[in-house]
């Protein structure tokens, strides 16, 4: 099973990715993890990437594709792989295609923007323990305080509504075009293209898991 999960921040991709990697026995491949591992191992591509990053530059798509190819030769990828946060842009998707890197499915998890804003801006955390709550879906026993210690809960900067809206804008401008890219490729060249599936990310974790499993069997 070789696939990409697409969807806006807060759509639940992380939860579903964890289910898929366990279910299919495949690794979740993140470009960030890959870069860090290559730099640490001192591979030729890792050293090249380190040079660029140390100079404050952005690692080129060609370099990323090289790292992806290296990563996919490792034994844990024998049954497949799940790309996490990659590709992010059309040039990266084109580079992936040109490199002949195989994909079986591209799955989009669709959640209305208003739901995402409610999901993310409602999160509250207890900094010392990491316990998390949600003002609507998983509220603390007493408003605004941790169940165990009674200490105040905080809203992380990442979860503030204006930050969430900004991240959604970035997604719409940068990554959303990938949805059109893969869906139109699947329509125009079904034999060569990965199968494109769209599922709703609204509902319980188990409901979404069930939709995802069905999508990957069709």
Curated annotation (Swiss-Prot):
It comes from Bordetella pertussis (strain ATCC 9797 / DSM 5571 / CCUG 30873 / LMG 14455 / NCTC 10739 / 18323). Consists of three domains, a large central CORE domain and two small peripheral domains, NMPbind and LID, which undergo movements during catalysis. The LID domain closes over the site of phosphoryl transfer upon ATP binding. Assembling and dissambling the active center during each catalytic cycle provides an effective means to prevent ATP hydrolysis. AMP binds at residues 31, 36, 57-59, 85-88, 92, 156, 167. Residues 122-159 are annotated as: LID. GO terms for cellular component: cytoplasm. HAMAP family: Adenylate_kinase_Adk (MF_00235). Pathway: Purine metabolism; AMP biosynthesis via salvage pathway; AMP from ADP: step 1/1. It holds the Pfam family ADK_lid. This is Adenylate kinase. The lineage of its organism: Bacteria, Pseudomonadati, Pseudomonadota, Betaproteobacteria, Burkholderiales. GO terms for biological process: AMP salvage. Residues 30-59 are annotated as: NMP. GO terms for molecular function: adenylate kinase activity; ATP binding. It comes from the Bacteria.
